[in-house]
From Swiss-Prot:
InterPro entries: c-SKI_SMAD4-bd_dom (IPR014890), SAND-like_dom_sf (IPR010919), Tscrpt_reg_SKI_SnoN (IPR023216). May interact with daf-3. Keywords: Nucleus. The gene is daf-5. Residues 1-12 have a biased composition (Polar residues). It comes from Caenorhabditis elegans. Changing E162K: In sa310; suppression of constitutive dauer formation phenotype on a daf-8; daf-14 double mutant background. SUPFAM superfamilies: SAND domain-like (SSF63763). Belongs to the SKI family. It is found in: Nucleus. Expressed in ganglia in the head and tail and in the anterior pharynx. Residues 1-22, 34-58, 299-318 are annotated as: Disordered. One of its GO terms (biological process) is negative regulation of BMP signaling pathway. This is Ski protein homolog. Probable component of transcriptional regulatory complex with SMAD protein daf-3. Required to regulate entry into a developmentally arrested larval state known as dauer, in response to harsh environmental conditions. Involved in larvae undergoing cell-cycle arrest during the dauer stage.
């Protein structure tokens, strides 16, 4: 059997190795050689080349000084552990003067100052010196720096301060509204990936579909712990506030090789996410985030502490003095001091209670009280308007009482309100036995319809359909509530209610229908003109004859025949019948009665006046009317 692998029974397979970025790629080597070759082209032969442009020949002694860009920064105030600290925003990152931090630690304990300086060297924190313009900007606007009598400033980024505090913090400090109720059945799984670049397993993983949340820092958020420590770490079971939890992790700490920027604990709303993204959990988390913002911001002068804050309990790990082997030993020795944790909690509660007794409303709302709050939108303006209506006792109950006293005050206020309401309804019931409470209807989100409508069944069909359509619109608006601000949500509701008819509003307000209007009174009948008896003396025959002739009616007059004689008379040619020249009045009355019996003259009877017959007879005497 030969030594050569060719033809041997045991074939040696080539070693399979995933190519790394540091491997020498022949293509890159060829490109590099071509680049070096083309850069050596000094003669301009008209051929394309990748070499750099030739420098212009200038006279000796002429030097071009290029101005180096330097961001002078913008002065601003930031909050650090409840204290207002001056800072400079350089390239979008706030930088704090280290001299201010040294002065704060010196007032507390000189050992803390030495430990802080050793910690900066151990953590290999990047520190920059302030330029003259930056130094003047801080000294002119900050009285704290002016009182230090310093000639230079050393700036440290807020990201480094935040991450160092997060690495040293074991638990958050107790708040004023702290209680020990940690209900396991009422918690939500949350996670943050603020320090995922420390996780070497995630960085070295080749799985492109791996969820980054699986490698994050996990914890449990308790819903019933608002304005206090509400998140428990899943790994160490430490209790944290949201601002402290995003700086907490259990990755191996790397003192060098990373540059942290943009680390801001006040952005916990964007950094913490719900791991179990069910509708119930997301709705509860969004409500918690919304209620975490106060109605208005205090001014910086009013927000400054009026009294010296009490000394904080030992809830954080001590800062080491040396960076050698004594590091772990100091942690163990200091960690053994806190044995009885419940006793420390009771002491902290007692200290907070004494502190609350010395506080006033001005410590929460400033010297000007609720009138000094400046709203940022209409929703905050409504809240501040309600605060201005409250008396001193109500404001004191809101800000100065303990949680137990506050809950008792709320229950007493609700009971008083119910008693007063029942008394008013009882008085109305005594006056009117048919009185009913006029509580308006309410929209049930789970059912998607309105409840407590007593007059819905008695409403018209169009009104009932309109209320059902309004309920569908309210249900759609409730689905989009997560994407809207509270003020936008209220304006959408008002816009929907503006288009509702008056009868639908009446049904939603539980107002009974209006009684039907009484029928209108019948119109007054015109009084008939008194009918006077017809007499021949009141008839105007002249006017009557003119009306008859104008209407085309011919009066039926009798044919007059000559008297009969016994002697034969000669034959006389007949002539048209005519009235006698001198008829008597009796004959005329007889003829007029015959004419008035005609149906065509019945409509003229009410118009005949007294003496009409006599006038008509006088007219016929002088006028001949042909038949």
């Amino acid at each position: 059997m030969s030594d050569s692998p060719i033809g041997s029974s045991q074939q040696v397979e080539p070693e399979h190795r995933t190519p790394d970025l540091m491997d020498i790629d022949p293509l890159i080597a060829n490109l590099k050689a071509l680049h070096e070759e083309t850069r050596s082209d000094d003669d301009d032969d008209g051929q394309p080349s990748t070499s750099a442009k030739r420098k212009d020949s200038r006279a000796d002694g002429i030097v071009i000084h290029q101005k180096k860009y330097s961001d002078p920064g913008r002065f601003l105030w930031i909050w650090l552990l409840g204290v207002r600290v001056p800072a400079l925003s350089i390239d979008g990152e706030p930088h704090l003067p280290i001299e201010i931090l040294d002065d704060m630690l010196t007032k507390k304990d000189k050992k803390d100052q030495m430990s802080f300086q050793n910690l900066l060297r151990y953590k290999n924190v990047y520190i920059r010196m302030a330029s003259p313009s930056q130094f003047r900007a801080v000294m002119e606007k900050s009285k704290e720096c002016e009182n230090l009598n310093i000639t230079s400033l050393s700036l440290m980024s807020r990201s480094d301060i935040e991450r160092i505090m997060g690495e040293l913090r074991l638990e958050s400090m107790l708040t004023l509204a702290e209680h020990d109720n940690w209900d396991i059945s009422d918690r939500v799984h949350v996670v943050h990936v603020n320090f995922i670049d420390y996780c070497s397993e995630w960085l070295e993983s080749d799985d492109l579909e791996e969820d980054v949340m699986q490698s994050g820092t996990h914890g449990y958020w308790y819903k019933n712990r608002r304005n206090m420590r509400c998140i428990e770490c899943q790994h160490c079971e430490g209790k944290f506030t949201p601002t402290d939890f995003i700086m907490h992790h259990h990755y191996p700490i790397k003192p060098s090789g990373f540059v942290h920027t943009g680390c801001n604990s006040f952005q916990w709303i964007r950094l913490i996410e719900v791991f179990d993204k069910s509708n119930e959990n997301l709705e509860a988390w969004n409500k918690f985030v919304l209620n975490s913002h106060r109605a208005g911001k205090r001014e910086y002068d009013e927000a400054a502490p009026h009294q010296a804050p009490p000394k904080r309990p030992a809830m954080e790990t001590p800062v080491p003095v040396a960076a050698d082997n004594g590091w772990e030993a100091d942690e163990e020795e200091e960690g053994e001091e806190i044995v009885d944790r419940d006793a420390d909690i009771e002491k902290c509660k007692l200290r907070n209670k004494k502190k609350m007794e010395n506080l006033h409303i001005a410590d929460f709302l400033g010297p000007s009280g609720s009138k000094g709050l400046k709203p940022r939108n209409k929703f905050e303006a409504v809240i501040i308007e309600q605060l201005n209506k409250m008396d001193d006792a109500a404001l004191e109950a809101l800000f100065l009482k303990s949680p137990e006293e506050y809950n008792l005050w709320v229950k007493e206020s609700d009971f008083t309100h119910k008693v007063v309401t029942q008394q008013q309804e009882w008085k109305a019931k005594m006056k009117d036995p048919n009185f009913k409470s006029r509580a308006s209807a309410n929209f049930d989100v789970s059912k998607g319809e309105f409840d407590n409508m007593r007059h819905f069944d008695n409403a018209s069909k169009a009104t009932r359909q309109e209320i059902q359509q309004l309920a569908e619109q309210f249900a759609n608006l409730d689905r989009d509530a997560k994407l809207l601000t509270p003020m936008e949500f209220v304006l959408r509701e008002h816009a929907l209610l503006k288009n509702v008819s008056a009868d639908a509003i009446r049904v939603l307000c539980n107002r009974p229908p209006l009684p039907p209007l009484p029928p209108p009174p019948p119109p007054p009948k015109p009084k008939p003109a008194p009918v006077q008896p017809i007499s021949l003396g009141n008839i105007n025959f002249v006017a009557l004859a003119q009306q008859l002739i104008a209407s085309g009616i011919k009066l039926p007059l009798p044919i007059v025949t000559p008297p009969v004689v016994s002697t034969p008379a000669p034959v006389i040619t007949p002539i048209p019948a005519a009235l006698p020249i001198s008829p008597n009045s009796d004959f005329l009355k007889q003829q007029l009665s015959t004419a008035m019996s005609s149906p065509a003259l019945l409509s003229l009877y009410p118009k005949l006046t007294a003496g009409a017959y006599e006038q008509l007879a006088q007219f016929i005497k002088t006028t001949t009317v042909k038949n």
